């Protein structure tokens, strides 16, 4: 039986003085180890999702940690029968997840994590508002029961939604979620900076939730959209039927 492909997602909000200098080093290590995927670099940190053998993706992760001088990295690994990415790309960006809000200090303002095992109980409380921070096309594929859909086309539209719905959110316990956790880091930071006090988010995102709980209470409805050739995964994190992007 052939070895399954490991898919590693990792992000960290860490100051990188010259992110462009990391590009050739990461490309060299990644290509030498036959790793495929995308790594985004900016002065605010890094965000990557890449696939290969378990050993190879972890070598790239260790290189990222070394080059950015950080151990504080959010990491998620799952597995696939084949590579969900077609090649390795390392790109320089203004933000590792684009929200277009200047001077937002994610490490200073951050929501409180809710562990996956506690999420179902928390979001069914009467005084909790649940907000899906993802885009509308992702929400259409699947979301949590009773979650608010901001109907955004891009994450850059989320701040405007937050401003327009400030009264709706005022004084409430706000539970937010996204695919792997990174958008929640920024969206909870935004709401905290706006003065909302009780702001929470699902630790590890939907993917970690499905892995840990198998959706045992059926509060997750549908499939989870992902940004690779699988397009969507089911409760068991296997590619959802009918979504796989055929290679040309």
Swiss-Prot record:
SMART domains attached to this UniProt entry: RHOD (SM00450)
UniProt cross-references to Pfam families, sorted A to Z: Rhodanese, UPF0176_N
InterPro entries: Rhodanese-like_dom, Rhodanese-like_dom_sf, TrhO, TRHO_N
UniProt entry keywords in alphabetical sequence: Oxidoreductase, tRNA processing
Record-level GO BP terms: tRNA modification
EC number: 1.14.-.-
Domain Rhodanese, chain residue ranges per copy: 124-218
Catalytic activity: uridine(34) in tRNA + AH2 + O2 = 5-hydroxyuridine(34) in tRNA + A + H2O
Gene Ontology molecular function: any one: oxidoreductase activity, acting on paired donors, with incorporation or reduction of molecular oxygen
Highest taxon in the source lineage: Bacteria
Enzyme class: oxidoreductase
Catalytic residues identified in the record: 178
Gene3D superfamilies (alphabetical): 3.30.70.100, Rhodanese-like domain
Sequence similarity: Belongs to the TrhO family.
HAMAP family for this protein: TrhO (MF_00469)
Free-text function comment from the UniProt entry: Catalyzes oxygen-dependent 5-hydroxyuridine (ho5U) modification at position 34 in tRNAs.
Name assigned to this protein: tRNA uridine(34) hydroxylase
Phylogenetic classification of the source organism: Bacteria, Pseudomonadati, Pseudomonadota, Alphaproteobacteria, Rickettsiales
Gene: trhO
């Amino acid at each position: 039986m052939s070895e399954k492909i490991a898919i590693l997602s990792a992000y960290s909000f860490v100051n990188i003085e010259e992110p462009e200098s990391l590009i050739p080093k990461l490309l060299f290590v990644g290509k030498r180890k036959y790793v495929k995927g995308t790594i985004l670099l900016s002065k605010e940190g890094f965000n990557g999702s890449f696939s290969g053998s378990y050993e190879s993706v972890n070598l790239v992760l260790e290189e990222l940690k070394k080059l950015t001088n950080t151990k504080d990295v959010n990491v998620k690994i799952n597995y696939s029968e084949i590579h969900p990415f077609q090649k390795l790309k390392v790109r320089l960006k203004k933000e590792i997840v684009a929200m277009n809000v200047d001077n937002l200090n994610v490490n200073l303002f951050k929501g409180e994590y809710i562990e996956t095992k506690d999420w179902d109980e928390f979001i069914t409380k009467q005084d909790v508002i649940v907000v899906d921070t993802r885009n509308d096309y992702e929400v259409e594929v699947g979301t949590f029961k009773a979650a608010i859909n901001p109907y955004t086309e891009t994450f850059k539209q989320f701040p405007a939604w937050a401003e327009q719905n400030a009264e709706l959110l005022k004084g409430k316990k706000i539970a937010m979620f996204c695919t792997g956790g990174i958008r929640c880091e920024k969206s909870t930071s935004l709401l905290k900076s706006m003065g909302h006090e009780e702001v929470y988010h699902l630790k590890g995102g939907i993917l970690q939730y499905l892995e840990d709980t198998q959706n045992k209470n059926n509060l997750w409805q549908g499939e989870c959209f992902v940004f690779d050739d699988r397009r969507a995964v089911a409760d068991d994190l296997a590619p959802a039927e009918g979504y796989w992007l055929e290679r040309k």
